[in-house]
């Protein structure tokens, strides 16, 4: 796995999200700070946020308004299913 470059974040998409976007992993520079996970989602042009989506920062589930720091890994996750 690659790490985020200084001043940037590593963004991961899983399952249907990566299928829709056409990519699984991307490094994104943080031009302004502070920035939230939701703002990263919006800057990537991934469509409207849905309350069924989940976001993890550094492998911990957080709310979309959680602040992102340079070097963080953001993972956007589709709705969980199964039983």
Give a label for each model feature.
Residues 1-82:
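Ubiquitin-like/PB1-type beta-grasp interaction modules and other compact soluble beta-rich domains
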